[in-house]
């Protein structure tokens, strides 16, 4: 059952990522039709902006993420021996280099991982997590975060965030080009083209315009669907490492029972946390939820 869940989640992720890339190209094609009456120009624009933006995002240092979330590095075992030993042992079981270790001085129990590859991985936990969890529960949470690093989830989520940003940039650019085109006579040219092409040309133009306007909303929903799926995968992978689903279940129950929101959370970092730092209590995931409900995660773990 465990390995079936892992395989199913990996397949689902592949489909989501492929769909995401196709969606970006579709947005580019729609912009090409709207602005230049040529979808190929839009495809080239989308591919170029996407490639550059993804490269910039992927090359960004994990230290930037840590700084945004006020995380302080643990540089020696003596500073946090239990945390250090847990991260070291889980990394060894996972077969990856030991990630850098950080602590966020926040009373709300939570954790996150960053780093685009296992060689550049880093794990951060809040002070509240260290104070609230027993060691076997901490192992479950750390195994979850180590799984994110081993499964290249941070790289995937970085690409997804970049693609959402690219779509937002393209959509905004299209609106500006349409506006300036209308001021400089582009509208008259478009009307002439529509007269030559008939009603079909008008319909294509309107559909493309609506698609471009809605694209950022759809892209954000896809990004969060990917995030929720990777949380399920990391839970299953954590059990693969610890062979003890109860530790992760108990940790989730304790975190769910804690009502304190994190005091300082970077909005752009919300999706990377172990559980939603905003303490959502939903029983069913919404389209724009970065995490599945904790009750749903526990149910899946109990069925392994």
Swiss-Prot record:
Name the Pfam families on file. Answer: Peptidase_M48
In short, the EC number is: 3.4.24.-
Q: Which cysteines are joined by disulfide bonds?
A: none
EC class: hydrolase
Q: Could you tell me the membrane topology recorded for this protein?
A: Multi-pass membrane protein
GO terms in the biological process aspect are:
proteolysis
Instruction: Supply the InterPro entries for this chain.
Output: HtpX_protease, Pept_M48_protease_HtpX, Peptidase_M48
> How many cofactor units bind, and how?
Binds 1 zinc ion per subunit.
- A GO molecular-function descriptor: zinc ion binding
Keywords attached to this entry? Cell membrane, Hydrolase, Membrane, Metal-binding, Metalloprotease, Protease, Transmembrane, Transmembrane helix, Zinc
What residues make up the catalytic site? 145
Q: Where does Zn(2+) bind?
A: 144, 148, 231
Its protein name is: Protease HtpX homolog
Where can this protein be found?
Cell membrane
Residues annotated as region Disordered?
275-304
Give the cofactors, semicolon-separated.
Answer: Zn(2+)
Record-stated family: Belongs to the peptidase M48B family.
Q: Its encoding gene is what?
A: htpX
In terms of domain of life, where is this protein from? Answer: Bacteria
Q: Which GO terms describe its cellular component?
A: plasma membrane
Where would you find the membrane-spanning parts of this chain? 14-34, 39-59, 159-179, 202-222
């Amino acid at each position: 059952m465990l390995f079936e869940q892992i395989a199913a989640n990996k397949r689902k992720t592949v489909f989501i990522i492929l769909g995401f890339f196709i969606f970006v190209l579709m947005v580019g094609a729609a912009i090409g039709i709207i602005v230049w009456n040529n979808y190929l120009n839009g495809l080239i624009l989308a591919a170029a902006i996407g490639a550059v933006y993804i490269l910039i995002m992927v090359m960004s240092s994990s230290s930037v993420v840590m700084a945004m979330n006020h995380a302080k590095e643990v540089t020696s075992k003596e500073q946090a021996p239990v945390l250090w030993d847990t991260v070291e042992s889980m990394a060894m079981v996972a077969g990856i280099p030991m990630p850098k270790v950080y602590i966020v001085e926040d009373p709300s129990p939570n954790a996150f991982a960053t780093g685009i590859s296992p060689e550049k991985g880093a794990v951060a936990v809040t002070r509240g997590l260290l104070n609230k969890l027993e060691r076997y529960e901490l192992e479950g949470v750390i195994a979850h975060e180590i799984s994110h690093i081993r499964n290249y989830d941070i790289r995937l989520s970085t690409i997804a965030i970049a693609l959402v940003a690219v779509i937002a940039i393209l959509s905004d650019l299209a609106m500006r080009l349409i506006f300036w085109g209308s001021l400089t006579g582009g509208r008259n040219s478009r009307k002439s083209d529509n007269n030559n092409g008939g009603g079909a040309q008008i319909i294509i133009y309107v559909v493309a315009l609506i698609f471009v306007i809605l694209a950022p909303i759809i892209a954000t929903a896809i990004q969060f669907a990917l995030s929720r799926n990777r949380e399920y995968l990391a839970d299953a992978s954590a059990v693969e490492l610890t062979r003890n689903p109860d530790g992760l279940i108990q940790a989730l129950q304790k975190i769910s029972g804690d009502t304190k929101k994190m005091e300082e959370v970077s909005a752009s970092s919300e999706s990377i946390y172990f559980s939603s730092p905003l303490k959502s209590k939903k029983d069913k995931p919404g389209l724009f939820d970065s995490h599945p409900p904790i009750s749903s995660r526990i149910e899946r773990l109990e069925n392994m």
